[in-house]
């Protein structure tokens, strides 16, 4: 899918990504067959195993020092390696780290999960792209956003 943005930027190689007033600091990258919260309890959201695929997951801490919450349903995440695109999603842990949620409130610090689906045998993405709009509002045009950030993640150690 051809995506466009009015303003494009590239995060520096390394562990941090800045998106509006939210700072993402990566701790690790890993390949997983399923993605669960750190302390699952009762009913919880998770990504179950998909035959023929592995999840490439970048996790760490996100800190929202802004005045707006982020609903990840309003942004688009994908991974890339050369001409290959990987479908992606951004989720957060709730405060108890017992569930995966799609919202980060203002003045919050939460664990984040950039989750990208990779075919078995395929190299994982070396870049994560995030497309979003002012105030994190929903895009009016399916393939156009106000901002895009390219975040090189190939320097993260794959566990």
Annotate each language-model stretch with its function:
Residues 1-57, 61-159:
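Conserved functional micro-motifs across diverse proteins
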């Amino acid at each position: 899918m051809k995506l466009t943005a009015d303003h494009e930027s590239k995060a520096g190689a390394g562990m941090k990504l800045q998106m509006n007033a939210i700072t993402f600091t990566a701790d690790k990258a890993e390949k997983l067959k399923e993605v669960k919260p750190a302390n699952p309890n009762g009913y919880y959201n998770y990504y179950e195993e998909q035959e023929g695929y592995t999840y490439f997951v970048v996790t760490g801490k996100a800190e929202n020092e802004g005045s707006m919450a982020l609903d990840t349903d309003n942004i688009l995440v994908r991974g890339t390696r050369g001409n290959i695109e990987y479908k992606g999603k951004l989720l957060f842990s709730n405060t108890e780290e017992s569930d995966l949620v799609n919202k980060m409130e203002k003045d919050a610090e939460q664990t984040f999960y950039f989750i990208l689906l990779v075919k078995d045998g395929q190299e994982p993405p070396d870049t994560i792209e995030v497309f979003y709009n002012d105030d994190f509002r929903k895009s009016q045009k399916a393939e156009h956003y106000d901002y895009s950030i390219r975040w090189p993640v190939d320097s993260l150690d794959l566990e």
